[in-house]
């Protein structure tokens, strides 16, 4: 037994040495790696979400970037957020971004883009629905009745009547005649109400390619004109935040997009319309219908959002990172499969919010599955880096001990790029209650932060 153990250990050493002796430009020796640990390059340091939530000025940019540099920060993500006064994506905004990139370059820091005015990604601070009114997200709401009387309460999208063998479409008849008895399933299209959060508009349908193309044009092409010469250099990439396909309408509502029924029929060979009740009740071949429905949504979300976004970034030398709507599982109506979406990222990412340990399916810190999913996706797709947006809403009382235990837990599971949530330009007024803490001069421990 002893000689087998010795042989096994010797084999391990041979493999370890052979792996670590593979030359990498500039990092091909133990001494150079050790030196880099002592003083990491900017790409191996953390980069917080730098919250622009005030009237932004060159003086504020210069002062805070220098402060970040002095405290060991390697870069920032320019993150517009509530409280912002400088008009988003205006010429003034883009000029300030240019100044931040130039100043970051002079400090040997990275200046990443964040693709939205707050979140979730996709509506471009209201510019997308303003320029494309039909981009608004929708939902299909079901109401069940025992009779139908004229006039109908609304103009339904679809009316089904239950029969002995399934369901029949009586939409046209229901608009001109009453049905005194039976089982009727009425489906209505719902659209969200305008909201200040979405710039006075509504969220958009990310299962439509033309919506994504409008978003990329309005957002990333604007940045490309202003700072595109630094794409892939001082500006390494772009962060998407919580894009999702949540249906509008609340209770008894399913996802809807104009291509849904045609895509479903082409993929599965039968008409989803006549099987919609199976998405609400355990009737018919409901398990197969639900699987096929959510698989279709996933195809639409990947094909019309994730892939074109990823392709744009690849073409323009940007690393596509960020994350989808949290990592609760399973909630397919929000994001059918986070791991499948992560395949279309140059740096797959997650959210790890708050400061409470939990291992449940809806957990943040403690959700091992979420971290291992992105590490696995990165490994399978040949990507080296994985990102975590960490510490958000941890509270003003979060300690260094808390920060280290959360960070260490993520690192040991495979995260290798830490994105702190958040670093505020200002905390005046209500801003101080926007998911604190802040990795900035506002914290009493900031002077010691470089040690951590």
Language-model features and meaning:
Residues 1-4:
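Positively charged n-region of N-terminal signal peptides that target proteins for export
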Residues 8-15:
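Bacterial N-terminal signal peptides
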Residues 15-31:
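Bacterial Sec-dependent signal peptides at the C-terminal "C-region" and cleavage site
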Residues 29-75:
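Mature N-terminal segment immediately following signal peptide/propeptide cleavage
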Residues 30-49, 191, 204-214, 222, ...:
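An acidic-aromatic substrate-binding cleft motif
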Residues 44-47, 57-62, 75-76, 81, ...:
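Carbohydrate-binding surfaces of carbohydrate-active enzymes
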Residues 51, 154-166, 219-222, 230, ...:
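Hydrophobic alpha-helical membrane-insertion signals
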Residues 79-213, 217:
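Acidic/aromatic-lined carbohydrate-recognition and catalytic surfaces
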């Amino acid at each position: 037994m002893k000689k087998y153990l010795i042989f096994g250990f010797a084999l391990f050493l041979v493999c370890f040495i052979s792996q670590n002796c593979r030359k990498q430009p500039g990092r091909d020796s133990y001494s150079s790696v050790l030196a880099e640990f002592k003083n990491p390059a900017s790409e191996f340091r953390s980069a917080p979400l730098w919250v622009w939530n005030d009237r932004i000025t060159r003086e504020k940019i210069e002062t805070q970037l220098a402060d970040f540099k002095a405290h060991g920060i390697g870069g920032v993500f320019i993150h517009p957020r509530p409280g912002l006064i400088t008009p988003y994506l205006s010429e003034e905004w883009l000029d300030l971004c240019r100044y931040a990139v130039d100043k970051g370059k002079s400090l040997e820091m990275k200046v990443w883009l964040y693709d939205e005015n707050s979140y979730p990604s996709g509506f471009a601070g209201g510019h997308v629905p303003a320029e494309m009114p039909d981009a608004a997200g929708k939902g299909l709401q079901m109401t069940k009745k025992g009779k139908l009387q004229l006039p109908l309460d609304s103009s339904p999208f679809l009316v089904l009547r239950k029969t002995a063998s399934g369901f029949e479409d009586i939409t046209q008849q229901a608009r001109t005649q009453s049905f005194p008895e039976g089982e009727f399933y009425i489906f209505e299209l719902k659209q969200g109400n305008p909201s200040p959060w979405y710039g006075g508009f509504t969220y958009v349908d990310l299962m439509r390619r033309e919506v994504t193309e409008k978003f990329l044009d309005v957002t990333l092409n604007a940045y490309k004109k202003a700072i595109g010469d630094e794409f892939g250099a001082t500006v390494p990439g772009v962060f998407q935040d919580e894009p999702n396909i949540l249906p509008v309408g609340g209770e008894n509502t399913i996802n809807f997009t104009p291509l849904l029924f045609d895509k479903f029929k082409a993929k599965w060979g039968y008409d989803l319309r006549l099987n919609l009740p199976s998405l609400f009740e355990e009737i018919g071949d409901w398990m197969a219908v639900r699987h096929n429905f959510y698989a279709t949504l996933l195809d639409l979300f990947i094909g019309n959002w994730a892939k074109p976004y990823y392709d744009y970034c690849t073409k323009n030398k940007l690393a596509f990172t960020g994350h989808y709507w949290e990592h609760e599982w399973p909630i397919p109506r929000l994001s059918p499969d986070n791991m499948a979406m992560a395949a279309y990222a140059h740096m797959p990412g997650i959210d790890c919010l708050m400061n409470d340990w939990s291992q449940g399916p809806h957990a943040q810190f403690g959700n091992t599955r979420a971290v291992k999913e992105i590490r696995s996706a990165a490994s399978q797709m040949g990507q080296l880096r994985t990102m975590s947006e960490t510490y958000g809403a941890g509270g003003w009382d979060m300690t260094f001990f808390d920060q280290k235990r959360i960070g260490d837990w993520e690192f040991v599971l495979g995260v290798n790029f830490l994105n702190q949530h958040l670093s505020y330009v200002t905390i005046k007024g209500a801003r101080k209650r926007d998911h604190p803490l802040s990795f900035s001069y506002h914290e009493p421990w900031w002077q010691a932060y470089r040690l951590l």
